[in-house]
């Protein structure tokens, strides 16, 4: 297991309330964007341009690609745009979990942006998928997100 993976226990998890909502970043390749559209879940995209920003004031799960060189090299794994978004305290406070994408060619650092963010924010790392994802990934993530929100809504009744 990579050193950036941290086990988050149930007592640490603040489950989301409301309806499923995804905040995501996608580079100009649009791989993550195309994947998110398949989920058919309400979403908002973190802008590619660093001089633009968004604010979020409701529970969400973050979906991000991974940028890194493989092996133990994880410098730059989390896109700068995602870091900027999470540096906003309010945006960060509503993050309830993270999902990452990556390329299995990078071995141990496949999807490592997810565990890095999970560890930093103490939120669960929910799933990782490769590049554009598969229909199985779409089904799994939809199931995970709806169950995650259902649990949160039930706990707060």
Swiss-Prot record:
It comes from the Bacteria. GO terms for biological process: protein modification process. Pfam families: Flavodoxin_NdrI (PF07972). GO terms for molecular function: FMN binding. Belongs to the NrdI family. HAMAP family: NrdI. Probably involved in ribonucleotide reductase function. This is Protein NrdI.
